[in-house]
UniProtKB/Swiss-Prot annotation:
The lineage of its organism: Bacteria, Bacillati, Actinomycetota, Actinomycetes, Mycobacteriales. This is Triacylglyceride transporter MAB_2807. Disruption phenotype: A double lprG-mfs deletion strain is more sensitive to the antibiotics tetracyline, vancomycin, rifabutin, clofazimine, novobiocin and ofloxacin. GO terms for biological process: lipid transport; response to antibiotic. The record marks R424 as: Forms salt bridge with Gln-157, probably closes bottom of cavity. It is a multi-pass membrane protein.
C-alpha cells in the first residue's frame, strides 16, 4: 500500500520552506541551550536555593528532571503534532517553555526550581521531533537528510553554546535567573516566526488520534528505567539497592505498553504502511549513539579533573573539541546522505566514532603531551581523537532520522521523529546512569587493587610522600577506568554500525513522492 504526503509542504517555494524550517530550528536551539545551560551556573543555583556546595548530588534533579520531562512528553507531543498540526504544537510548546522559565527564575527553593525545569523539559520535548517532522513534511525523502542534519546540528550547537550562554547571561545581568528571564522574549519571538512561516494544518479526518494511555505507559517505563540504573553511592555498588524492584517495574510498564499497543484502536504508531524492521534498526542505532554521546559528555570532563588534574573550567574546555565536531559532522552527514544514501553514511559514521573511541581508550596518563606521528607531520592526540569521535557521531544524526521517517507514512512523521529522539535520549540517560555508575565503581576497585599491590611502608611514614603516593594511585585508577569505559563505548559503536546496515534505503521506500 502506497501513501502520499498529506501536508502541503512540498509544493511550497523553497524560500518559504527554508524560512519555516529556520523558525523551527531556532526553537530547537532555544530548547537545546536550556538543556545544558545549568552546567556552568550550578554553584550559583545551589547558593541561591540554600544547598551546600559539598551536597551537589541534591541538585541532580535540576538536570535529570528536565531530561525525564523531555523524554516522557515527547511521544505524546509528537503524535499530537500529527493530529493537530506542527504549527499549533510548536507554539504551545514554546509557550510552555516560557512559563517553565518564569517558574524557574522565580524559584526560592529546590522543589520550585525542579518543577520549573520539568515544565521546561516537557515543553522542549516537542520542539526537536516536531521540527524534524516539519522538515520531513516540507522536503521529499531523497533530499530531506540534509535538512534533518541541519536541524540536528542546531540541537548539538545548543550543547556547545549552552554553558557559554549561561556564563554570558550571568556576566551581563549579574544573576543566574537572567538565563531564564531571557527565554521569555526569545520564546515569544519564536512563536511569532512560527505563526507566519509554518504552513497551517490541513484538517484530515483520517489523521491518527493521540494515544494518551500508550504514551503514559511508555513514559513510566522510561522513567523507572533511569531511576533503577542510577546509583547514589557507586563506591558500594554500580546499581542502587532498589534496582531490582524498580527495573522490574520498568519491565512491567513496558510489557503493559506492548500489550496496550497490540490491542488498542488508537496507538502511538499505526502499523499500516510501517516497515518495522528498518524503523527499529534506526531506533536501536540512535539509542547506541546517544549512549556514546553521554559517556563522552560526562567522562571527558571528569578525566580532565581526575587524570590531568585540571580545574573545572579547563576540564570543560577539553570537551569543546568534541562538541564543535558534533554539529559539523551533522551538517556533513546530512549532505552526504542526500547523495549516497542514509544507510552507508550511518554505518560509516558509527565506524568512525568507534575508531575515535578506540583511540581515546588508549590514552596515556600524559595525553596532553602525546601526539599522532604521521612522519611528515604530527597531530595532538587528545584533540584529534575527540574530533574523530565527534565527527563520527555527528555524521549519523541526519541519516538515522531520515531513514526512520522514510519507512513510516507521512501522517505519522511526528510520532516517528519523537521515537527517534526518545531512543537517542534514552541512550544518553542509560549511558549516564549505567556506565557512569559502573565506571565510578570500577575506579574504586582499581584504586583498592593498586593499594594492595603497593609495598607496606617501613619506619615512620612521611606525610608528603603518602600524599603523593595517594595522588599517583588515584590518577592511575582513573586512567584505567576511563580506558575501560571508552573501550566499551567503541564496542557499542561497532554494534550500532552493524545495526545501521538494516535501516531503510531510497530504493525500498515508497511512502512519498521523490
Amino acid at each position: 500500500m502506497t501513501h502520499t504526503a498529506t501536508e502541503p509542504g512540498t509544493s511550497l517555494p523553497l524560500r518559504h520552506r527554508s524560512i519555516a524550517i529556520g523558525a523551527g530550528s531556532l526553537a530547537v536551539l532555544l530548547g537545546a541551550l536550556d538543556t545544558y545551560v545549568v552546567v556552568s551556573v550550578i554553584t550559583d543555583i545551589m547558593t541561591s536555593v540554600g544547598i551546600a556546595l559539598n551536597n551537589i548530588q541534591q541538585v541532580t534533579p535540576i538536570v535529570t528532571g528536565y531530561l525525564l520531562g523531555y523524554i516522557a512528553a515527547m511521544p505524546l507531543l509528537g503524535q499530537a503534532s500529527d493530529r493537530f498540526g506542527r504549527r499549533l504544537i510548536l507554539q504551545l510548546a514554546l509557550a510552555g517553555f516560557a512559563i517553565g522559565s518564569v517558574i524557574t527564575a522565580l524559584s526560592t527553593d529546590l522543589t520550585m526550581l525542579v518543577s520549573g525545569r520539568v515544565i521546561q523539559g516537557v515543553a522542549s520535548g516537542a520542539l526537536l521531533p516536531v521540527t524534524l517532522a516539519l522538515g520531513a513534511d516540507l522536503w521529499s525523502q531523497r533530499n530531506r537528510a540534509t535538512v534533518l542534519g541541519g536541524i540536528g546540528a542546531a540541537q548539538e550547537l545548543g550543547s556547545v553554546l549552552g554553558p557559554l550562554y549561561g556564563v554570558l547571561c550571568v556576566w551581563l545581568f549579574g544573576s543566574w535567573t537572567a538565563i531564564f528571564w531571557v527565554n521569555v522574549p526569545l520564546a515569544i519571538i519564536a512563536i511569532v516566526l512560527v505563526q507566519f512561516s509554518v504552513p497551517a494544518h490541513q484538517h484530515d479526518p483520517d489523521r491518527p488520534k493521540v494515544d494518551v494511555v500508550g504514551g503514559a505507559l511508555l513514559a513510566v517505563a522510561l522513567g523507572l528505567l533511569v531511576v533503577g540504573l542510577y546509583s547514589p553511592d557507586p563506591k558500594v555498588s554500580a546499581l542502587p539497592e532498589w534496582a531490582l524492584p524498580v527495573l522490574s517495574g520498568s519491565g512491567v510498564a513496558f510489557l503493559a505498553f506492548i500489550l496496550w499497543e497490540s490491542r488498542a484502536k488508537t496507538r502511538l504508531i499505526k502499523p499500516e504502511g510501517v516497515r518495522f524492521g528498518p524503523f527499529f534498526a534506526a531506533l536501536a542505532a540512535s539509542l547506541a549513539a546517544g549512549a556514546a554521546l553521554m559517556v563522552t559528555l560526562v567522562n571527558i570532563e571528569l578525566l580532565g579533573q581526575g587524570v590531568l588534574q585540571m580545574d573545572k573550567a579547563d576540564a570543560v574546555f577539553l570537551l569543546s573539541r568534541f562538541l564543535v565536531a558534533l554539529p559539523i559532522g551533522a551538517v556533513i552527514g546530512g549532505w552526504l546522505a542526500t547523495r549516497f544514501g542514509d544507510r552507508i553514511i550511518a554505518v560509516i559514521g558509527m565506524l568512525i566514532a568507534a575508531f575515535g573511541y578506540y583511540l581515546i581508550s588508549g590514552w596515556p596518563v600524559d595525553v596532553l603531551a602525546a601526539v599522532h606521528n604521521f612522519g611528515f607531520f604530527t597531530l595532538p592526540r587528545l584533540d584529534t581523537d575527540l574530533v574523530v569521535a565527534g565527527i563520527g557521531l555527528g555524521l549519523v544524526i541526519g541519516p538515522l532520522s531520515s531513514a526512520a521517517l522514510r519507512v513510516v507514512p507521512a501522517a505519522q512523521h511526528g510520532i516517528a521523529s519523537a521515537l527517534v529522539v526518545v531512543a537517542r535520549m534514552t541512550g544518553m540517560l542509560i549511558g549516564m546512569a549505567a556506565l557512569g555508575g559502573w565506571g565510578i565503581h570500577r575506579f574504586y576497585q582499581n584504586f583498592d587493587a593498586l593499594a594492595a599491590k603497593e609495598p607496606k611502608p617501613t619506619g615512620k611514614p612521611n606525610l608528603l610522600e603518602l600524599q603523593q603516593q595517594l595522588l599517583n594511585r588515584s590518577i592511575t585508577a582513573y586512567s584505567e577506568m576511563y580506558s575501560e569505559m571508552f573501550a566499551i563505548t567503541a564496542v557499542v559503536c561497532v554494534i550500532a554500525a552493524v545495526i545501521a546496515i538494516f535501516v531503510g534505503s531510497h530504493r525500498k521506500s515508497g511512502h512519498e513522492a521523490q
